[in-house]
Amino acid sequence: MESSSSLKGSALGKLVVTSGLLHSSWSKILEIHNPPYSNHDPGLQVSKKKKDSGLEFQIHREEKFTLVVFSAPPICRSSSSDSTLLHVKDKENPFPFLCSENNPSFSLHTPAFNLFTSASTSLTYLKSELLQTLKSEKPVIITGAALGGSVASLYTLWLLETIEPTLKRPLCITFGSPLIGDASLQQILENSVRNSCFLHVVSAQTRIKMDFFKPFGTFLICFDSGCVCIEDHVAVTELLNGVHDSGLVDYSQVLNRLDQSMLSLADSRLIPEDVIKGIEKRAEMKNLRFDMMFKKLNDMKISMAYIEWYKKKCKEVKIGYYDRFKTQLAFPSKEFDINIKNHHKSELNRFWKSVVEEVERRPQSDASILKRRFLFSGNNYRRMIEPLDIAEYYLEGRKEYRTTGRSHHYVMLEKWFGMESILIEKERCKKRDLSDLLTFDSCFWAEVEDSLIVINQLNTTVGMRDDVREVLTRKLVEFEGYVWEIITKREVSPEIFLEESSFMKWWKEYKKIKGFNSSYLTEFMNTRKYESYGKSQ
């Protein structure tokens, strides 16, 4: 069985139908709801039934996969629409990892959420077992019907966070289950690889209440004459919206009617024409937005050219562009410097923030294409422009940029570039001229500024305790080690050694504190070897 994350829509549905997983899942669901008088299944593990909630689960260790079945009592109609709001800062939120800067909170289906949290101890133990199973490369299927399927979905979301990227992800299969989250959760999951781990089997005669709760994952909608798989959540809503019967529905006959081949959406006569047209239009709009981004990327090259020209002009007057920009922010005098800040830098920041948002919004297969197309341009932008944002940040009297002030889009651009393992960037050829190099670590100047703040504390604080002084001095030594590492790797621009740079200001103060203690960096600086750094040999 392939990892569900590698499959889309109808492909996932076809795999599950032809593999017999639906019948296997449903038969085990029937067993947990109507247990036989005797069961000699050696691979069966049964949880103790929760007296307070009625939640139960069983583990079936089959030859080819492990199946976890959740069972829950029917929902009271009075509470079927209740929701629980979870915020990223809530201590009792078991899903803080789903929250983001754009979506700091979301709501869950209260009956399912209460059942899930009531069995936290048992489910934690189950998680440990399943992680070991996944490490053995045996697929894990998590399933349930009605409210049991809703709890299975919550459990799968919780389990997915702890699974290593190299392992197969579990597949969650639900049957006629209430939706578990609001529009915020839907938006969070459609941006995530987690979305491909859910297959919801629903009879076309079933009507699911969607006025507040919204669908995610893939839906296998079963008609009398066949079935279709749909990922488009708007189409799912149009086809299934209505009142939901919260009880357990027998899907045995539904599964028996399924053809062994999936109907393709384009050829299907089971879906109204207006729904199909809506799906096609939304797909077209996504592609149009995709194309516009590539066109805009070419426009951004003009602003990058201005910044590169600015960097070159600064170097001609023996000052790095970081320090020139910082000085002009404090004492603006040149119109060109002002334009760099207010027009070119701002335009580039807006564009790249939108790129990151678009990548995070897209399915993983599309996102990987987008990231590859934008990879090098985004990396050059980050290394060129983030130092200018850092200059603004510290001019406002702030500190610790890397941990408290860095924009999310810079973090993601750096992460994506690192994930690609670009061998070209691993090591600079010793014979190559580095005069135009952009420092690899775009937070370098933030590290310099923080070290200058530490030096100022050491020089100006009266009566400082010895332990505090030791901690601050250790920070300077750590920064020295960091600087020496990127120098030896040839990953830092020679501009840092210009006499008026903030780094040289740091060095002049640091060597007073360092005294006669020698190190690789002090020998490099004191003998002025830095003057030949980066020159072709």
UniProtKB/Swiss-Prot annotation:
Main localization category: membrane
Q: In which tissues is it expressed?
A: Expressed in senescing leaves.
The knockout outcome noted for this protein's gene is: Delayed onset of leaf senescence (about 4 days later). Reduced resistance to both virulent and avirulent pathogens (Pseudomonas syringae pv. tomato and Hyaloperonospora parasitica).
**Which sequence ranges are marked TM in the entry?**
140-160
Tell me what reaction this enzyme catalyses.
a carboxylic ester + H2O = an alcohol + a carboxylate + H(+)
Going by the UniProt record, its keywords in alphabetical order are: Cytoplasm, Hydrolase, Lipid degradation, Lipid metabolism, Membrane, Nucleus, Plant defense, Signal, Transmembrane, Transmembrane helix
- Record InterPro entries: AB_hydrolase_fold, EDS1_EP, Fungal_lipase-type, SAG101-like
User: Which molecular-function annotation in GO is an example for this chain?
Assistant: carboxylic ester hydrolase activity
Location comes to: Membrane; Nucleus; Cytoplasm
Known function: Acyl hydrolase that triggers the leaf senescence onset. Can use triolein as substrate to produce oleic acids. Involved in the EDS1-dependent intrinsic and indispensable resistance signaling pathway; together with PAD4, required for programmed cell death triggered by RPS4 in response to avirulent pathogens (e.g. P.syringae pv. tomato strain DC3000 and H.parasitica isolates CALA2 and EMWA1) and in restricting the growth of virulent pathogens (e.g. H.parasitica isolates NOCO2 and P.syringae pv. tomato strain DC3000 avrRps4). Contributes in reinforcing the immune response around hypersensitive response foci. Regulates the nuclear localization of EDS1.
> What is the recorded name of this protein?
Senescence-associated carboxylesterase 101
The organism named in the record is Arabidopsis thaliana
Task: From the UniProt record, report the name of the gene that encodes this protein.
Answer: SAG101
